[in-house]
């Protein structure tokens, strides 16, 4: 395992500046956000200008890209899958093998979500990329049992584990071991049952226990700091603290 950080940690800065801040904080690996609603690079831009997107994502200032976080807002199903396909080709061109995607919102028919995930996995597999479905409150993966069922029903699907949503969400800190065997990517911040993000060291995330559970499943990939910019929060200090904390446990 190794420590990384998401460009979402500096979503208020241009991509070049966000990457430089992460370098200054001594990170060596990065998850890059491709988000239509405000990421550093939009999936529609990737689809329209793939080669330009590849060039941008290769200029990472000594940071190694380890995952893309993809959030698409398309007018049609065909456009949605075309943009996702372009993101997969970007991943292959930049030697990234993980794409994190969100599950659909609660209330979506289970079979419809299975069909969507099957198509995403099919497109990703063509480029040698793994789809990691994010565990998230308010969405179909908010229940760890359901998240595990998705992986069992969609061959090749994995999970992006965000344990904060199992601590703060409806799960309220109950065990979630059943998802561990399916994890391909991890996002971390400190959280309590009442607040998704608190200062590092003031939350309920048991980092040592979590890393032990991942190690039992032979997980060797990124532990990605994903701390959102907030008013009155020293972002640099928080990112430095979580990096040092995670590195001390490895």
Where are each of the predicted segments found?
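Conserved phosphate-coordination/catalytic loops
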Residues: 9, 13, 44-48, 78-81, ...
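A general secondary-structure boundary signal
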Residues: 26, 33, 80, 128-129, ...
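Active-site beta-loop-alpha junctions enriched in small/polar residues
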Residues: 6-10, 33-37, 70-73, 104-106, ...
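Active-site acidic/histidine proton-transfer and metal-coordination neighborhood
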Residues: 16-17, 51, 55-64, 70-161, ...
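Charge-dense, low-complexity intrinsically disordered segments
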Residues: 40, 44, 78, 107, ...
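Histidine-acidic metal/acid-base catalytic patches
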Residues: 1-4, 11-28, 54-61, 95, ...
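Glycine-rich, proline-tolerant flexible connector loops at the mouths of alpha/beta enzymes
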Residues: 31-55, 107
């Amino acid at each position: 395992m190794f420590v990384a950080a998401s460009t979402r940690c500096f979503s208020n800065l241009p991509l070049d500046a966000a990457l430089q801040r992460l370098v200054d904080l001594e990170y060596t690996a990065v998850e890059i956000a491709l988000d239509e609603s405000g990421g550093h690079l939009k999936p529609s831009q990737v689809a329209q200008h793939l080669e330009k997107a590849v060039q941008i994502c290769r200029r990472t200032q000594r940071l190694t890209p380890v995952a893309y976080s993809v959030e698409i807002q398309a007018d049609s199903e065909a456009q949605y899958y075309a943009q996702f396909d372009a993101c997969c080709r970007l991943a292959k061109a930049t030697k990234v093998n993980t794409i994190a995607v969100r599950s659909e919102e609660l209330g979506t028919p289970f079979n419809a979500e299975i069909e969507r995930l099957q198509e995403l996995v099919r497109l990703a597999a063509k480029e040698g990329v793994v789809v990691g479905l994010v565990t998230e409150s308010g969405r179909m993966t908010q229940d760890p049992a359901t998240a595990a069922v998705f992986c069992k029903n969609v061959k090749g699907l994995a999970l992006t584990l965000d344990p904060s949503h199992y601590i703060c969400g409806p799960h309220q800190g109950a065990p979630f071991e059943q998802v561990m065997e399916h994890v391909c990517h991890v996002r971390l911040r400190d959280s309590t049952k009442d607040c998704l993000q608190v200062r590092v060291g003031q939350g309920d995330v048991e980092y040592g226990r979590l890393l032990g559970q991942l190690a039992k499943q032979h997980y060797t990939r990124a532990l990605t700091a994903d701390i959102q910019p907030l008013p009155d929060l020293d972002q640099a200090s928080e990112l430095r603290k979580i990096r040092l904390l995670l590195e001390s446990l490895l």
